[in-house]
Amino acid sequence: MKSVALCCRFPEVLIAALPLLLALPLSLALPVWADTESGSCTLRLSGGWVVDGSGEPGFQGDVLLDGERIVAAIDRADPRGTAWGNGLHCAHTRDVRGLVVAPGFINMLSWATESILLDPRALSDVAQGVTLEVMGEGRSMGPFVNPQRANLRASAIDAGVAPQWRTLGDYFGMLRQAGIGVNVASYVGATTIREYVMGRKTRGPNESELAKMRSLVRQAMEEGAMGVGSSLIYTPANYATTDELAALAAEAAQHGGGYISHLRSESQHLLDAVEELIEISERSGARAEIYHLKAAGNANWSKLNQVIDAITTARSRGLEISANMYPYTAAASGLDAAMPPWVQLGGVDLWVERLKDPQVRQKVVAQMRDPHPDWENLLLDGADKARLLGVKTKALRRYVGMTLAEIAAARGVSPEDAAIDLVIADRSKTRIAYSVMSEANLRKKLQLEWVSIGSDASAPAAEGRFLYQSQHPRAYGSFARVLGRYVRDEAVLELEDAVYQITGLPAANLGLTDRGRIAPGYFADLAVFDAGKIIDTSTFAESHSYAKGVQHVYVNGKPVIADGKPTGALPGQIVRGPGWKGSVQTAISQR
């Protein structure tokens, strides 16, 4: 795949340099691939195939680093550049002949919020070449009031984490102080904001509540948030109105941020949900992105073409609309995505208590079987398409890896009753993989120039307490799968296009001007991999399995993977959005 938009990009560095070049005699013009103000070089990556993240063709050459920044990317076919580079002494040289040198990969949908506190190396992602985790799908790690902190603590203590922070800025500060192996960015969660102001109310906000919500978005933007993220199929987020979301997105846009959303529907009402996102972008002035773009359920697969048409039309009108995806046909969520929202109101305790009532249970079962529900039901394609990934309760671990149909048969109950039993016994911690997408649609999405990649997973290690829970393979394999299966093995897209879609594209969508490219002055976030060997190895049966083929990964110029092995280094930084005002004094009440 080589669309006009992908093949004809003019490098931004060259564009910026044109006035200078045109003003100088040809003999005095400076090479655009070099930071001429830098007089030192700490590392030379020598002889690799450089794919710079722009979508332009790669070249054999050298990438020179000075500490945490890139000094130059030199094409060996350019005698002048080679001569300049050879004249610059580098303290260290690493021979990377036969390997691809690319910008570090950007995970546009990361749930490493808690796993990075347990193990700051983020190895499942780093082993694939990921150098930036972008969090905040609906829920973010602040701002919190005490009830929210208590709920998070109840959940997180199961994973060995006791949250002490209140704001997103506090969370950033804690990560920075503790040390992290990858860079971290985050949107502020629209659900988190809503619960802070309104609790779990099922109505839209009044004028004063909306003003408070906007002020919290403003504070989060000043703390470094990338914008506002929503997840509209889950309670209580599903009660957010379009007006409410547009107002929050507008506040983010005033600070240079964007809006990103798990759509209100990915199945029966998919087209309406896409139009809502486009409307929010148009009304707010915010660029907008769709989380894990999909047409879920066999009956809805044909809708993807209409979605693509709608987004293409919106983009032609000047709106900045994009999407991300993961390269698997199975989604993953909880059993809350298989039950009507009303039964979940008020949180886990009330949800469980309601399900224990025989009359409520009967009503829930009937609605779970309704082929045309007015809510998003990921079980519509059948219990044989829903596989148990993980539970908290030890007594239930014997079911991990089984489908809901198999669990129901083993327990002698219906699949709907089995799901209800799991929620009651595990108190909603149950994780399910739902096979709801088509391979043909997956390939079609990969070829769209405005689609990037997000794992929609945490970043565990294949060791310790992480082994108690199975994982969706996307946690260990999303990026390697794109480069191995869909680029090398099946030629669905070209290497330069794929690298652009996991580096330069998401960086541009985030408004980053110094990451996502191999260019002078950019941060030295780099992935060095063997294009002939890179591949995902994680499966549903053996999920804790690292990807293969990545030899070296640099985060801010420091190696976190060297010769295919983790170094233990923690050089990650907080990547803050354009509204950041440095050290922000918290204005959040301590209630």
Question: Where would I find each of the regions flagged by the language model?
Answer:
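Bacterial N-terminal signal peptides
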Residues: P11-P31
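Metal-associated gating/positioning segment near the N- to mid-region
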Residues: T93-P163
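Divalent metal-binding pocket/active-site signature
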Residues: Q219-E276
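C-terminal cap of metal-dependent C-N hydrolases
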Residues: D357, K444-V451, D456, A527-Q573
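Histidine-rich, glycine-flanked metal-binding segment
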Residues: D35-R44, V50-G104, D119
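Active-site neighborhoods of metal-dependent hydrolases
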Residues: F172-L175, I180-E207, A211-Y234, A249, ...
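Acidic, glycine-enriched loop/beta-strand segments at the rims
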Residues: V50-D62, T430-V436, N441-L442, E490-V499, ...
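Divalent metal-coordination and catalytic microenvironments
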Residues: G48, E68, G98, L109, ...
